[in-house]
Amino acid sequence: MDIDPYKEFGSSYQLLNFLPLDFFPELNALVDTATALYEEELTGREHCSPHHTAIRQALVCWEELTRLIAWMSANINSEEVRRVIVAHVNDTWGLKVRQNLWFHLSCLTFGQHTVQEFLVSFGVRIRTPAPYRPPNAPILSTLPEHTVIRRRGSARVVRSPRRRTPSPRRRRSQSPRRRPQSPASNC
């Protein structure tokens, strides 16, 4: 049975696999980010969104996996076997949890549509031969205008849409030849 955890979010496991392995942040950094940004939503009783639920499940899976590794490390005497098991877990299950947390945190931060566009454009870039690629890779770095920004100790603040500042008006030189001459000044 082929279960794709990203299908209900309009993405796929294949799209996430186009991203290089070193693209995803360390697992501890992702866990810290998730708990810092969404601790209330993750520990609360209310259902916030499917992304919050997916993050909650990924954190529970990683906790259980960490307990299993700790138990195995305590009960295995061979240092080499212990190292191989930890490396295997980090390279397989750890990577899946990192991908999962990154995807759902990015969807909450940037919006699901933006993340999907990024994954597709990155996938197209990777499949395009190097001589035909545009010079810059797709970047997922700008916050959309509807992003919710939380400040410590305060309620949610919704960011207002960005407005263009008016361009400064040019001042004309006040040199003598440009000053408007009034008829009375000619006398």
UniProtKB/Swiss-Prot annotation:
UniProt repeat feature Sequence, residue ranges: 160-164, 167-171, 175-179
Organism: Arctic squirrel hepatitis virus (ASHV)
GO MF term set: DNA binding; RNA binding; structural molecule activity
Family named by the database record: Belongs to the orthohepadnavirus core antigen family.
Protein name: Capsid protein
Quaternary structure note: Homodimerizes, then multimerizes. Interacts with cytosol exposed regions of viral L glycoprotein present in the reticulum-to-Golgi compartment. Interacts with human FLNB. Phosphorylated form interacts with host importin alpha; this interaction depends on the exposure of the NLS, which itself depends upon genome maturation and/or phosphorylation of the capsid protein. Interacts with host NUP153.
RNA binding, as annotated region: 181-187
Single GO biological process annotation from the record: microtubule-dependent intracellular transport of viral material towards nucleus
GO cellular component: host cell; host cell cytoplasm; T=4 icosahedral viral capsid
PTM summary: Phosphorylated by host SRPK1, SRPK2, and maybe protein kinase C or GAPDH. Phosphorylation is critical for pregenomic RNA packaging. Protein kinase C phosphorylation is stimulated by HBx protein and may play a role in transport of the viral genome to the nucleus at the late step during the viral replication cycle.
Keyword DNA-binding: yes
Function as written in the Swiss-Prot or TrEMBL entry: Self assembles to form an icosahedral capsid. Most capsids appear to be large particles with an icosahedral symmetry of T=4 and consist of 240 copies of capsid protein, though a fraction forms smaller T=3 particles consisting of 180 capsid proteins. Entering capsids are transported along microtubules to the nucleus. Phosphorylation of the capsid is thought to induce exposure of nuclear localization signal in the C-terminal portion of the capsid protein that allows binding to the nuclear pore complex via the importin (karyopherin-) alpha and beta.
UniProt keyword terms in alphabetical order: Capsid protein, Cytoplasmic inwards viral transport, DNA-binding, Host cytoplasm, Host-virus interaction, Microtubular inwards viral transport, Phosphoprotein, Repeat, RNA-binding, T=4 icosahedral capsid protein, Viral penetration into host nucleus, Virion, Virus entry into host cell
Compositional bias annotation for Basic residues: 151-180
Keyword DNA repair: no
Subcellular location: Virion; Host cytoplasm
Region (Disordered) location: 151-187
Annotated InterPro entries: Hepatitis_core, Viral_capsid_core_dom_sf_HBV
Chain spans, region 3 X 5 AA repeats of S-P-R-R-R: 160-179
Modified residues (Phosphoserine): 160, 167, 175
Motif Bipartite nuclear localization signal boundaries: 163-180
Upper taxonomic lineage: Viruses, Riboviria, Pararnavirae, Artverviricota, Revtraviricetes
